[in-house]
Regions:
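Post-HExxH zinc-binding segment in Zn-dependent metallohydrolases
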Residues: 308-348
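Contiguous, non-catalytic segments that form substrate-binding/exosite surfaces or channel walls
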Residues: 129-277, 516
Length: 522
């Protein structure tokens, strides 16, 4: 595993900084070699996670949890070694003279941030969190299937206990929730999330209330045969740019995307034969957005910490852009509806395009976040953001979660879940310890509108391209301006480069208002 220590500084060739005869380029190569092994362990863990959620029989949960804990612990121990810190100490003054946007300068800066943070977390705690997350996911899946919150509650209690211990590793943080948010949105503060959500909540509630209270369209309940859903989902995924050579699509309970490398992307989806809103096409377009971000990264960054998306919010901006801004647009359905209607003729043969488009976009309060329309979706996220803070810091007992959830759903969304399966048990995130992730979904929605405005300023015929089923130029624009950079820049810096300013909810609210107005006029 490399070396035992970094030699003291020596004198190199004229004009070249050298450590005991080794050039800076050699030290960078050493750092890359060390990091590559750690990244490889992370990939191995993701393969195990993918298998657990897609292929593994339920009986394998305990041994899988132990195996994942071992892999994560080994990766953590390798990364937090003193030798990595010494390498960074030697390299930082040297790369200071490089272009700050260069791969080498960014690699050192990002590795330093990651290393400093990881050093605060004891390996034993890291292993406990990983093992518990794997076991709790299986407990959640069973509890959800049986509508049995009581059986999941002990797992949630234990998860919250470990999250509190994790937060205590970072005592200097202004707001303890910042620690959790930073895992997914580095550098963002909880106050900034509150600022955005304070602007969004009343506006989203007003937009929801203004929507006509239509009776559900009968064709929403299908039938939508699973095999046809799968074929159409693959067709659109390929059209967007998810080539079979680099992507695969599998069914799962809760759709997700995992990237093992820029050329190995795993997509998952779910199928609902009796609910158009749960049609696999929408979840597939969402996960393809994540996958395209990973696939569009510079392959030169593979096997480094830079080879992934910049942040969860920017990642979600891409899943929501491809799913909603493109995939729920009228131009998209002008292109794809003839094919879709033919595949589901039993449900849609007599349904005109405009009626179909209106049905899949109209605001409609509903129980399930992943099936929510664009307007009410943010209210689902605000609910989770509030409850997470109350669970961790506000005295909300896990015993009271179902009632707190249902009451808040009535207040924010306007519906009360009839059971916990479509209430507090619907999401996998808390079982996996992913506290702090939910806000990034709505931040991603906000960013998707900002990014689309910027894209259209360069490609004013973007929607015309969509209507022709031509997505290549859109993908290439996103790859050039966002995807290829991976994690080289902080989320704030990447957002500034991408849209010319910080995250701003106004373009998103304009987008929703314009869309809802056009739907009302249809």
């Amino acid at each position: 595993m490399g070396y035992a220590s970094i030699p003291s500084r020596g004198s190199g060739a004229p004009g070249e900084t050298d450590y005991d005869g080794r050039a800076v380029t050699d030290l960078l190569s050493t750092l890359r070699d060390e990091l590559a092994q750690i990244v490889d362990l992370g990939v191995a863990a993701r393969v195990l996670e993918w298998d657990q959620l897609v292929m593994m029989p339920r009986g394998g949960a305990t041994t899988r949890a132990e195996g994942l804990a071992t892999v994560h612990r080994l990766a953590h121990e390798l990364f937090v070694r003193d030798e990595i810190g010494e390498l960074l100490d030697r390299l930082e003054p040297e790369v200071a003279d490089l272009d700050p946007d260069s791969d080498d300068a960014c690699l050192v800066a990002v590795t330093r941030r990651d290393w400093d943070k990881a050093r605060r977390v004891p390996p034993a705690l890291q292993g406990e969190m990983t093992k518990l997350g794997s076991e709790a996911m299986e407990a959640w899946a069973e509890a959800r299937a049986n509508d049995d919150y009581a059986s999941f509650r002990p797992w949630l209690d234990r998860t919250l206990e470990l999250k509190q211990r994790y937060i205590e590793c970072f005592p200097a943080t202004d707001d303890p929730y910042d620690v959790l948010l930073d895992d997914f949105e580095p550098g963002m503060h909880t106050d900034e999330v509150r600022r955005v959500f304070r602007r969004l909540e009343p506006a989203l509630r007003e937009l929801t209330a203004a929507a006509a209270d239509d009776e559900p369209e009968p064709f929403l309940s299908g039938p939508y045969p699973r095999d046809a859903q799968h074929e159409l989902s693959l067709e659109v995924a390929r059209a967007f740019g998810a080539a079979d050579e680099y992507f695969r699509l599998d069914p799962t309970v809760h759709p997700f995307c995992l990237s093992f490398a820029t050329r190995d992307i795993r997509l998952t989806t779910r199928y609902a034969e009796d609910d158009l809103h749960g049609n696999s096409l929408f979840s597939t377009m969402h996960e393809v957005g994540h996958g395209l971000y990973e696939h569009g990264g510079d392959a030169a960054l593979d096997r480094t910490p830079l080879a992934t998306g910049c942040s969860s919010a920017l990642h979600e901006s891409q899943s929501r852009l491809w799913e909603n801004v493109i995939g729920r647009s009228l131009p998209f359905w002008r292109w794809f509806y003839p094919r879709f209607r033919d595949a589901f003729a039993n449900a849609l043969a007599d349904v005109p395009l405009e009626r179909f488009h209106r049905a899949v976009n109209r605001p409609r309060p509903s129980f399930i976040r992943v099936d929510a329309d664009e307007t009410t979706y943010g209210l689902h996220i605000i609910l989770r953001f509030q409850l997470e803070q109350e669970l961790l810091f506000g005295g909300l007992s896990t015993a009271d979660v179902p009632e707190a959830w249902n009451t808040r759903m009535e207040e924010l969304v306007g519906v009360r879940p009839p059971n916990d399966r479509v209430g507090c048990l619907q999401d996998v995130h808390w079982s996996g310890g992913m506290f702090g992730y939910f806000p990034t979904y709505q931040l991603g929605n906000v960013l998707s509108a900002q990014i689309w405005e910027r894209l259209v300023s360069d490609l004013p015929d973007a929607y015309e391209r969509v209507e022709q089923g031509s997505f290549g130029e859109i993908y290439e624009w996103l790859r050039e301006h966002l995807y290829r950079h991976g994690r080289k820049f902080t989320p704030a810096a990447m957002t500034e480069r991408l849209v010319g300013g910080p995250i701003d909810p106004e373009p998103y609210l304009r987008y929703l208002a314009d869309k809802n107005a056009s739907l009302a006029a249809a």
